[in-house]
Amino acid sequence: MAKADKATAVADIAEKFKESTATVVTEYRGLTVSNLAELRRSLGSSTTYTVAKNTLVKRAAAEAGIEGLDELFVGPTAIAFIEGEPVDAAKALKKFAKDNKALVVKGGYMDGRALSVSEVERIADLESREVLLSKFAGALKAKQSQAAALFVAPASQVARLAAALQEKKSAGDSAESAA
């Protein structure tokens, strides 16, 4: 690879690091081209799965201000650059690694810090943002209904008490007029 090509590759990878909300570093030893194509399809359009030379990736990470990943760039390494929601991509990688033992998740990077394998797996085990938001909205709606019931309850109790007093008074007046 010519020096100019390497510089371009480093700049491209550094740009991907900067644009990504998260990255997951994997080892793909033993995967076929068709396996890699299947993995890329399963990751969706918000994730770019890139195979690059470790030395170039290390330089690009340093250029992008990413620290703590150098020890992951050993052996055949590929990186999933995730733009947007990291949960779906982490789920897809975890499922693919479960089905294809040749794919090994080495770690990742998110929110300015390196992630261990277990942290990447925990992200994969989270529910998607949409599911969490809908659960939150449901909880808020339930609390609003409970609050509304609390506000309405005293007024209805007062109304029932007034009706009972009125009934009792009417019954008392009827008894006096009958006597």
Swiss-Prot record:
Gene: rplJ
InterPro entries per UniProt: Ribosomal_uL10, Ribosomal_uL10-like_sf, Ribosomal_uL10_bac, Ribosomal_uL10_bac_type, Ribosomal_uL10_CS_bac
Biological classification of the source: Bacteria, Bacillati, Actinomycetota, Actinomycetes, Mycobacteriales
Biological process terms in GO annotation: translation
Gene Ontology cellular component list: large ribosomal subunit
One Gene Ontology molecular-function label: large ribosomal subunit rRNA binding
Quaternary organization: Part of the ribosomal stalk of the 50S ribosomal subunit. The N-terminus interacts with L11 and the large rRNA to form the base of the stalk. The C-terminus forms an elongated spine to which L12 dimers bind in a sequential fashion forming a multimeric L10(L12)X complex.
CDD domains reported for this sequence: Ribosomal_L10
UniProt keyword list: Ribonucleoprotein, Ribosomal protein, RNA-binding, rRNA-binding
Name this polypeptide is given: Large ribosomal subunit protein uL10
Species for this entry: Mycolicibacterium gilvum (strain PYR-GCK) (Mycobacterium gilvum (strain PYR-GCK))
Similarity-based family: Belongs to the universal ribosomal protein uL10 family.
Main function: Forms part of the ribosomal stalk, playing a central role in the interaction of the ribosome with GTP-bound translation factors.
